[in-house]
């Protein structure tokens, strides 16, 4: 059996990795490696038990590949927050009404857990080398019920074609007449100088709506979500986030802002499966900006589906329809709004 993977990020390389582990001949076309030099955060503090389970699984996979650094995680929430998902998943946490220098209101709490810094660029680059990924970009072609790749004008056939190209998934599939249930959006973040006691914390503020992560010294990286696909951060974005940080920590000095492109799904979480119109096309996407947290676990399930024809906890792909890609299942904010 031969498999061809389109996409060289977390979803693509880990799907290829698990296929290779199962004895499948795999070729991969990854394009340019786009991950930042800074580590990405894996958190276990999420409202959906499915995401917590996959994050735990992904963490164990990462630990076999690189040194993982723990970091204190602080989630700021209203006192009525339901932490049942953490209890059911066995995640250790503390509930406090004060923490270091954070400024909290009377009806707010902090939930302290442990996050993990994942050197994702190093891991992905290493897997691309080990698996022989090409830096070339691939397009999809179709004849009857079979899909093939087109690379530099050359046709590449495979028994299984796996589309794992992130925000490019939908555009690539549309070229063969398939509308996938994914939509791209821009995710914004900015770099800051902050008080020393804050810089080492991974923070999710679900009252003021911002998050922050340790960046390369002496930077702190923070943001508040997403906007229209392929758009730059709005004017004054970094200053706006700095004001939110300052309300908690006293001060923050904004330096610059950047945007990236993420991909959402109708469920607000990751999706993977077989595209029913074709006999050999599979897709993994909708990682919604948290591919570093659950990507390897979802990729393992998709590889199992390709090899065995079935997989645990992998629902069928829904039909495509319009939805708000900014609704992220892993974000406590949306759970709290329903409370």
Map each language-model feature to its residues:
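Dinucleotide-binding Rossmann-like beta1-alpha1 core, especially the glycine-rich loop
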Residues: 38-104
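A conserved short coil-to-beta-strand element within the FAD-binding core of flavoproteins
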Residues: 132-148
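Active-site substrate-recognition segment that forms the wall
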Residues: 17, 21, 68-70, 167-279
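Short hydrophobic core segments
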Residues: 5-6, 156-168, 299
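Beta1/beta-strand and adjacent pyrophosphate-binding region of the FAD-binding site
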Residues: 1-11
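Glycine-rich FAD pyrophosphate-binding loop
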Residues: 20-38
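Short beta-strand to alpha-helix junction loop
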Residues: 53-56, 79-81, 108-126, 232-237, ...
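Flavin (FAD/FMN) cofactor-binding core of flavoprotein oxidoreductases
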Residues: 239-333
């Amino acid at each position: 059996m031969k498999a061809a993977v389109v996409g060289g990020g977390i979803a693509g390389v880990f799907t290829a990795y698990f296929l290779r582990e199962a004895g499948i001949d795999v070729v991969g076309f990854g394009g340019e490696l786009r991950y930042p030099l800074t580590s990405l955060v894996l958190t276990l503090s999420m409202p959906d038990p499915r995401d917590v389970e996959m994050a735990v699984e992904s963490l164990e996979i990462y630990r076999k590949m690189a040194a993982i650094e723990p970091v204190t995680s602080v989630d700021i929430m209203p006192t009525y927050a339901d932490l049942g998902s953490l209890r059911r998943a066995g995640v250790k946490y503390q509930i406090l009404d004060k923490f270091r220098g954070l400024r909290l209101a009377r009806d707010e709490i902090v939930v302290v857990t442990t996050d993990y810094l994942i050197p994702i660029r190093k891991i992905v680059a290493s897997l691309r080398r080990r698996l022989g990924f090409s830096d070339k970009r691939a397009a999809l072609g179709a004849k009857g019920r079979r899909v093939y790749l087109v690379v530099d004008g050359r046709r590449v056939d495979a028994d299984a074609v796996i589309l794992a190209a992130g925000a490019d998934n939908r555009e690539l599939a549309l070229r063969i007449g398939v509308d996938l249930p994914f939509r791209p959006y821009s995710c914004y973040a900015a770099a800051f100088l902050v008080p020393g006691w804050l810089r080492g914390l991974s923070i999710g503020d679900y009252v003021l709506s911002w998050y922050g992560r340790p960046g390369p010294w002496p930077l702190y990286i923070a943001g508040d979500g997403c906007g229209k696909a392929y758009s730059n951060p709005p004017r004054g974005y970094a200053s706006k986030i700095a004001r939110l940080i300052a309300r908690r920590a006293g001060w923050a000095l904004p330096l610059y802002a950047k945007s990236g492109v993420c991909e959402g799904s109708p469920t607000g979480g990751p999706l993977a499966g077989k595209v029913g119109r074709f006999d050999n096309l599979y897709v993994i996407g909708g990682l919604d900006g948290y591919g570093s947290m659950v990507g390897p676990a979802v990729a393992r399930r998709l590889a199992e589906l390709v090899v065995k024809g079935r997989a645990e906890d992998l629902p069928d792909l829904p039909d495509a329809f319009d939805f708000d890609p900014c609704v992220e299942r892993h974000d406590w904010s949306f759970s709290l709004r329903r409370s």
